[in-house]
Amino acid sequence: MARVPEPTSEVMSYGYSDNENDLFFEADGPGKMKCCFQDLNNSYLEEEGIQLQISHQLHNKSLSHFVSVIVALEKLKKISVPCSLPLQGDDLMNVFHCIFEEEPIILEKCDDNAFVHDAPPRSLDCKFQDINQKSLVLYNSYELRALHLNGTSVNQQAVFRMTFVQEDEDITKIPVALCIKEKNLYLSCVMKDGKPTLQLEMLDPKVYPKKRMEKRFVFNKTEIKKKVEFESSQFPNWYISTSQAEAMPVFLGNNRGGHDITDFTMELSS
């Protein structure tokens, strides 16, 4: 590591501090600085009057010794010395090239999943009705049913928290997770008795929702003419569906556009 040479007694006689760093932190610097560099048996750099003294005893050097190298070189640019050419920025670069060795920095590929919790996912509170105006209602704690509500019974309508999640799917579809607000009950798609089935799962609110949900909780939302439908990401071509009959369970069906209802209207909830 290079450092600024120790000041000679000749420099000390000019009334400056015996602290070597003070020579370079003065506003204008000592007028006869070049004398500090005349009697050292070190290599010259392009005969510009700059010398480097290499220290092999780094254990007793404070931070100020190393900082002095940079400060001193900046001061030398402003000091008048009998040189054929003024000290230039390129000359300073040559000094640093003698001191430091450049090494490449190899960046390892980062795992995107490690940063999914940096920011909470965006979500909306909303209510749903099928196109026959049947509302979705939580029934017996772990079952969703679709039925017509009126009067005071409208308060039974379930409020959902729709969370926008990350999925590598068709960009024309929006991946979301659906949770019954206040209950932490998430709609999920699982295989039961050889058939894709819709169910409700209670999840830890300290962990969920998250940006990358397990695939069984993800639905690809599509909106056409103010009507929305939700296709299971776990089971493509299977949709959240309701029956034409009253007060029947909401289920997962693959009869899109048929007798079963797969289109819903969405109302934002405050």
UniProtKB/Swiss-Prot annotation:
Which PROSITE patterns does this chain map to? INTERLEUKIN_1 (PS00253)
Q: Name one GO molecular function term.
A: integrin binding
Tell me how this protein assembles: Monomer. In its precursor form, weakly interacts with full-length MEFV; the mature cytokine does not interact at all. Interacts with integrins ITGAV:ITGBV and ITGA5:ITGB1; integrin-binding is required for IL1B signaling. Interacts with cargo receptor TMED10; the interaction is direct and is required for the secretion of IL1B mature form. Interacts with HSP90AB1; the interaction facilitates cargo translocation into the ERGIC. Interacts with HSP90B1; the interaction facilitates cargo translocation into the ERGIC.
Q: What is this protein called?
A: Interleukin-1 beta
PANTHER family of this UniProt entry? INTERLEUKIN-1 BETA, INTERLEUKIN-1 FAMILY MEMBER
Residue span(s) of the pro-peptide? 1-118
Q: What is its main location?
A: cytoplasm
Localization recorded for this chain is: Cytoplasm, Cytosol; Secreted; Lysosome; Secreted, Extracellular exosome
The reply to whether S-adenosyl-L-methionine figures as a keyword in the UniProt entry is no
Task: Show the InterPro entries listed in the entry.
Answer: IL-1_CS, IL-1_fam, IL-1_propep, IL1/FGF
Which residues does this entry assign to the site Important for interaction with integrin? 173, 181, 183, 192, 206
Miscellaneous comment: IL1B production occurs in 2 steps, each being controlled by different stimuli. First, inflammatory signals, such as LPS, stimulate the synthesis and promote the accumulation of cytosolic stores of pro-IL1B (priming). Then additional signals are required for inflammasome assembly, leading to CASP1 activation, pro-IL1B processing and eventually secretion of the active cytokine. IL1B processing and secretion are temporarily associated.
What Pfam families does the annotation carry?
A: IL1, IL1_propep
Family of this protein = Belongs to the IL-1 family.
Q: Which residues does UniProt call coiled coil?
A: none
Give the species.
Mustela putorius furo (European domestic ferret)
Annotated function: Potent pro-inflammatory cytokine. Initially discovered as the major endogenous pyrogen, induces prostaglandin synthesis, neutrophil influx and activation, T-cell activation and cytokine production, B-cell activation and antibody production, and fibroblast proliferation and collagen production. Promotes Th17 differentiation of T-cells. Synergizes with IL12/interleukin-12 to induce IFNG synthesis from T-helper 1 (Th1) cells. Plays a role in angiogenesis by inducing VEGF production synergistically with TNF and IL6.
The organism's place on the tree of life at top rank: Eukaryota
Q: What are its GO cellular component terms?
A: cytosol; extracellular space; lysosome
Q: Which UniProt keywords apply?
A: Cytokine, Cytoplasm, Inflammatory response, Lysosome, Mitogen, Pyrogen, Secreted
Tell me one GO biological process term.
immune response
Entry keyword Cell inner membrane: no
